[in-house]
């Protein structure tokens, strides 16, 4: 094993990377509330894992979506557990995200030179809410359908471009298969990729700038 490690160490400088990760200075004022961001990230990992598992059985069609969710809950081994974990970790992620935003704001973590870290964080908050909006409609039950109809109808109040935005979101004039397909695509591909890129940027800036000092 020593030779294998030495081979990788010579090429990747693993020890230097490990030292950089483990030797960052942590200010003495840091408390448990500074862990909320990490909890939010943990919830996201659970979302990715459980969501990926459910994509094997979920069918994004208006005729089969609800039945496929029922199948996951009643027929798939531990399907009920995966969906329950997905649902509860989604709620926990939103809650932790809100608490994290409040913690950063109240402790002044958004001030110079961390403005861009704050911007990426707020953008991540918008992405998180978008996860909730798109995922809520995927079972395509009565609640999901009407929630989708209401949410996609909101932009209609915008002058000039309102109707175009509604049709862009729905994929049609009315809510239907095109809408469900777009929500599924956004929920399982567009938003996860956006979240991953934003999180990587967010974490790199935190590593570079460190934790903000006390007020």
UniProtKB/Swiss-Prot annotation:
Cofactor(s) annotated in UniProt: heme b; heme c
Topology versus the membrane: Multi-pass membrane protein
GO molecular function, one term: metal ion binding
Disulfide bonds: none
Cofactor note: Binds 2 heme b groups non-covalently with two histidine residues as axial ligands. Binds one heme group covalently by a single cysteine link with no axial amino acid ligand. This heme was named heme ci.
Role, per record: Component of the cytochrome b6-f complex, which mediates electron transfer between photosystem II (PSII) and photosystem I (PSI), cyclic electron flow around PSI, and state transitions.
Protein name, per record: Cytochrome b6
Organism: Guillardia theta (Cryptophyte)
Gene assigned in the entry: petB
């Amino acid at each position: 094993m020593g030779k294998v490690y030495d081979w990788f160490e010579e090429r990747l400088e693993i020890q230097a990377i490990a030292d950089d990760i483990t030797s960052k200075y942590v200010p003495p004022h840091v408390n448990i509330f500074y862990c909320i961001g990490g909890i939010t990230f943990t919830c996201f990992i659970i979302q990715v894992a459980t969501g990926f598992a459910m994509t094997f059985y979920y069918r994004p069609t208006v005729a089969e979506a609800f039945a496929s969710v029922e199948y996951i809950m009643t027929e798939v081994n531990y399907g009920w557990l995966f969906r329950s974990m997905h649902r509860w970790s989604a709620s926990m992620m939103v809650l932790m995200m809100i608490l994290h935003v409040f913690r950063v704001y109240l402790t002044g973590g958004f001030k110079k030179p961390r403005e861009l870290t704050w911007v990426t964080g707020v953008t991540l908050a918008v992405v998180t809410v978008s996860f909730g909006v798109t995922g809520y409609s995927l079972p395509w039950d009565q609640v999901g359908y009407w929630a989708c109809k209401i949410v996609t109808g909101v932009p209609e109040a915008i002058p000039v471009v309102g109707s175009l935005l509604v049709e862009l979101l729905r994929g049609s004039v009315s809510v239907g298969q095109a809408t469900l397909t777009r929500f599924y695509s956004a929920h399982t591909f567009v938003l996860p990729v956006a979240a991953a890129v934003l999180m990587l940027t967010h974490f790199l800036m935190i590593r570079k700038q460190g934790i903000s000092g006390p007020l």
